[in-house]
Amino acid sequence: MADTASLRAPLCTEQFGSGAPRSCSAAADGSLQWDRAQRWGWFSRASITKPGQHEGGGRGPWAALTTLSGLRSVLLPQGFPDSVSPDYLQYQLWDSVQAFASSLSGSLATQAVLQGLGVGNAKASVSAATSTWLVKDSTGMLGRIIFAWWKGSKLDCNAKQWRLFADILNDTAMFLEIMAPMYPIFFTMTVSTSNLAKCIVGVAGGATRAALTMHQARRNNMADVSAKDSSQETVVNLAGLLVSLLMLPLVSDCLSLSLGCFILLTALHIYANYRAVRALVLETLNESRLQLVLKHFLQRGEVLEPASANQMEPLWTGFWPSLSLSLGVPLHHLVSSVSELKQLVEGHQEPYLLCWNQSQNQVQVALSQVAGPETVLRAATHGLILGALQEDGPLPGELAELRDMVQAGPKNESWILVRETHQVLDTLFPKFLKGLQAAGWKTEKHHLEVDEWRATWPLSPEKKVL
């Protein structure tokens, strides 16, 4: 009996990633017997195998589970789900739905462009079609360069909003392509405009996808996450291609039917994109999320967790905040005299200078050479608090008194309010920062829009603020 018990007792165990562990015991003949326990999401199984036996052998449900295992290794990053962010699966599912709808819409648009170029028309000129194609491509290339220069530095700050904007712009571009053959005189201009929009989509969509991939990769596995995302998109596009082969012959001769299909697919595309972007839970603060978290903190004394703040973050209106907050501006934009400089630095030793224009609701911040991420976060918090003084809503006692001063005082005494809020922040900000860290926010980095200007001034602190 003792020998039998010792044979059945596990000698060792092994585990792959987050899967269920399996144990090993000694067989009667002295060989090792492994309990095969594997978990594929909601699937699990256990059986006995000896060294040299193929774990994927056999038919029936085990073969099906082996197929699922193969698909998992092909389409999902290694170590899933531990190697990616918690929002990965929900985001990728909705992203696949939108990619499928976009693939079908793209097929309708491509067919319309080819018809407009004269494919299938014996009277069409090859040189005219070539000229149209060259004009279309050159317009898009110029647009790509200009947009990357104009908005490239802002894409990280509002990745979710720009991702949604890119997909809506892509739908608009495809609509123009579908309508282009109806107006042959304006065909070249229409398809050029469409390609310009698509090139902007390529810049905005590609850049924001890279930013989101950085968020999803939790084991420095950005390349693996990106590669598997590309594989998923390829599978979806292949499915879209097969469906398009069945759909196009049915709608090619009827413009109204093509438009009807396009409208339905566009509605699905936008909805799936919204759900995908809304599923994201980013743990870094941009201006919108910081404003939401700060407002909740001032009103209730609690810091919102990333999941709650991301659900409340505006996706459609994030481009037009009520307060104009500029971080990292040149010092000469803030002061023009020695007296103004003394007013700004009086009463505080923080490595930033802040100027508030009440009439325009504009806050400009000059940063010191020693300003680090937490300094930038404090400066942004300072600016948002000044903006809150011009709004309604509950505020802590000291800030409520300052709001009364704002409503009663002259607009040209803003520097006094800036100095007073510095003193309030000396007590308030450490509590706020500690609450952010406890709630799960990453305060060692941020996605606030900061320009490259830095300055020094007489009362700048010597100690570097991290």
From Swiss-Prot:
Q: Where is the PTM N-acetylalanine found along the chain?
A: A2
Q: What's the chief localization of this chain?
A: membrane
- Is-annotated flag, keyword Membrane? yes
GO cellular component terms, A-Z: membrane
Membrane topology designation: Single-pass membrane protein
Identify the stretch annotated as signal peptide in this record: none
Q: Where in the cell is it found?
A: Membrane
Q: Membrane: present as a keyword of the record?
A: yes
What residues form the membrane-spanning segments?
245-265
Which keywords does this Swiss-Prot/TrEMBL entry list?
Acetylation, Membrane, Transmembrane, Transmembrane helix
Domain of life assignment: Eukaryota
User: What family does the Swiss-Prot or TrEMBL record give for this protein?
Assistant: Belongs to the RUS1 family.
Protein known as: RUS family member 1
Could you read off the lineage of the organism from its UniProt record? Eukaryota, Metazoa, Chordata, Craniata, Vertebrata
